[in-house]
Amino acid sequence: MGTKRTDDDDSPPPPGVKRWIISCDESGTGGKPFYGFGSLWSPDQRRGDFAAMITDLRERYRYPYEIKWNKVNDANLKFYKALVESFFKTNYLAFHCLVVRMADVDLTHHSGSWDLARQKHFTRLLTNKIQRCLTAYPERAQTFRIWVDPIQSSYGKADEVVEIIANHVLKKLFGQVRSVDRVFTRDSKDTPSIGLCDVLLGAVMETWQKDSQREAKVELRQWIADHLGWPSLNHDTHKNEVKFNVWYFYDPTAGAPRAVKTEPVKLKYPLPQTVRRASNR
């Protein structure tokens, strides 16, 4: 989105407030059949645990480089498989993405602009998931901080627009002011949570695009699918999935058949009952 706001701060949330860090990335802006947005969710209070996990993996597998889907190869596959395994074993992390088929997008609803369409879909992903989180835990004071890798857009302050629109939508639903406290641009090279989001989103999108590349990537895609109990990543999930959620933005009025089949998730490492119960509210 060409975002410029980078003055993030590490100050803790107010006492009694649970802050979520939502690390975001995009994929498929190069004219491919689908584009998508991913979001990795983590409690702000677990930042230290996440950093320690990444440091341990880097040292164990001697991988000091940027975490990124396009960096996956035979030489570093063990690191990326361990990273994925750690994600699925870590209950406080969750991945939610939105996939849009370009052929289903009616640009007359977006002033003829792909930039605007993508911005709306990105904001829709965030507001939908934040709404579900606020609804699941109505007794809890929550706020949401969003980190985005610079996303392609002709508009230089798109992060601020996302923040304004998201808060407007959420205020109408919940009467709360500034559920999204800020949206910041973060360099993915220095932000492993965005890197992990990029890896998970890249695996989903490459499968949907039918864009097989390196054998290592194919193996990592299957590794992720195995942790979901799926034959492949060529599926979307039911809306209540918490750990790994693929939202296919399908428009049945467009006349085209669904691109994929919805598949129940059977996690290799099941979530605690309390987390699963909250997802069904």
Regions found by a protein language model. Name each.
Residues M1-R281:
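Phosphate-ester processing/binding pockets and catalytic centers
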